[in-house]
Amino acid sequence: MTVFDLPKIYTLFNACALLHIILGLVMIKMGQRKAHVASMTIALLFSAAFLGCYLYYHYHAGHVKFAGTGMTRPIYFILLFTHIPLAVLNLPMIIMTVVPAMRNRFDKHKRMAKWTVPIWLYVSVTGIIVYLMCYVWYGPPIRGWESGTG
């Protein structure tokens, strides 16, 4: 395995996190608090594993350029440019949602979760789509050193 295999792995982590976020939502709607906590904890762990792999990959692999052409480019960049700021915003929002729950402040937890969960879901889904567009459907991506642009 090389560093260039990491996008597959971190996207799998992202997909697992997405499934556990959805499961956690279903569980709390059904009144299954313990199952909700377990599922959301697993989602957090998968998200943390994703972030670690993602950062490691981009530190070692460098910049990658989208190889798609035509109308796929604006679609890709619209997804990417909505995904990135929401992904950055999402981490502190997740923390601000989890900490009150850990302190049994479920009123505050619920208020924050109403904002955090939709963003977390959007970031997870668009992250998977960005991966598919960049590495599977229109890839592989062009790395800066391969294109001669640095």
What are these regions (language model features)?
Residues 1-150:
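Alpha-helical membrane insertion/targeting regions
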